[in-house]
Amino acid sequence: MDSVDRFLYTSDHDGFLALTRETWQNRWFPSQIPLHLDVSHVHQLSDADKDFYRFLFTFLGMAERLVNFNIEDLVTNFNSHDVAHYYAEQVAMENIHGVVYANILKIFFNNSRGELLAYAAKIILDPALCEKLEWLHSRVRKATTKAQKILMFLIVEGIYFISSFYSISLCRVRGIMPGVCLANDYISRDELLHTKAASMLYNTMVEIQEKPSHAEVQALFREAVNIEIRFIQAKAAGVTLVNVVDIRRFLEATADRILRDIFVPPIFGTPPPEACPLSYTGSFKAVNFFERDNSDYTTCVTDDL
C-alpha cells in the first residue's frame, strides 16, 4: 500500500510554509482597486502614450495563456505538501491579476470587448512580442531537466514582465491613473514573492549535481535581459518619461539580484536607477496591508536590489 503520508498534511518545508503564510497575510482582491479616477486620465493621454499602455496591458492581460508555463506540471516534480500549498496560492493570485488586467483593459477600450479582441488579434503578430514569445517558448521546449524548468520559471517570474511594470509605475511620477498604479504595485510585489519562491525551489529542491554550470545560467539571464529590453525599446519611442536606458539598468540590477539569490555570480554589476519608480525597490514597509487602500505589504522589503 502506498504511504499515507501523501494524504495527511504535515509541514515538510519551513521556507514554503513561510511563503504561504506571507501570501495569506498579503492577499488582496480586484474590488480593492478603484479605477473611477483613471477613466478621465486615460482619455487625456497622448496618442503615443495611449498606444503604448494599451499594448502593455493587452500583453499582460493575455500573458497567462501566452506564456503557457504550467505551474501544476512543475509542482508535480516535488513531493512536498508545503510546495504544493504555496503554488496553489500563487495560482489563485495569478487569477486575480488576470481579473484586474481585464478591468483595466475595459478603460482603455471603452468597455468594448469587440474592440479589445480586434486589437489583441493584431498585436499577437507584433514583431517585438513575437520575438519575446518565440524565445521563451523555444527555451521552455529545451528545458528537459528539473533544474532547467525551474530556471525558466524564474526567468518568467523575475525578468519577463519587469520592463512593463517599470513603465506602468512611471504613471505615478506623472500623478495619473492612481488605480492602475495601485494595481501595478500589488502585482509587481506578488511577482517579487513568486520570484523568491522560484529561487527557493531551485536552491532547496534541486540537487547540486543536477544544476547547470554558472556560465550556462548567466548566459540564460543575459539572453532574457536582452530580449526584454528589445521588447520595450521597440514600443517606447515618444512615450512620456519612458527611458530605455533606465529600464535596462533596472533589468540588469534585477537579474544580478536573482543570480545572487541562487548563488550564481552576478554578471552586470549595474546599480538600479536612483529614482526608480517601482515602490518596492529599496523600500521598508511595516504598515498593515488592510488599513487603507495603499501599496504597503505586511512584509518588509529591504535592499531589494
UniProtKB/Swiss-Prot annotation:
Q: What is its main location?
A: host cell
What quaternary structure, including any partners, is listed in this protein's UniProt entry? Heterotetramer composed of a homodimer of the large subunit (R1) and a homodimer of the small subunit (R2). Larger multisubunit protein complex are also active, composed of (R1)n(R2)n.
Positions annotated as active site in the UniProt record: Y101
Annotated Fe cation 2 binding lies at E94, E157, E191, H194
Q: Which gene encodes it?
A: RIR2
Instruction: Write down the species.
Output: Human herpesvirus 8 type P (isolate GK18)
Q: Which residues cross the membrane?
A: 150-170
Any one GO BP annotation for this protein: DNA replication
User: Example GO molecular function term?
Assistant: ribonucleoside-diphosphate reductase activity, thioredoxin disulfide as acceptor
Protein name, UniProt field:
Ribonucleoside-diphosphate reductase small subunit
Enzyme Commission number(s) of this protein: 1.17.4.1
Where found in the cell? Host membrane
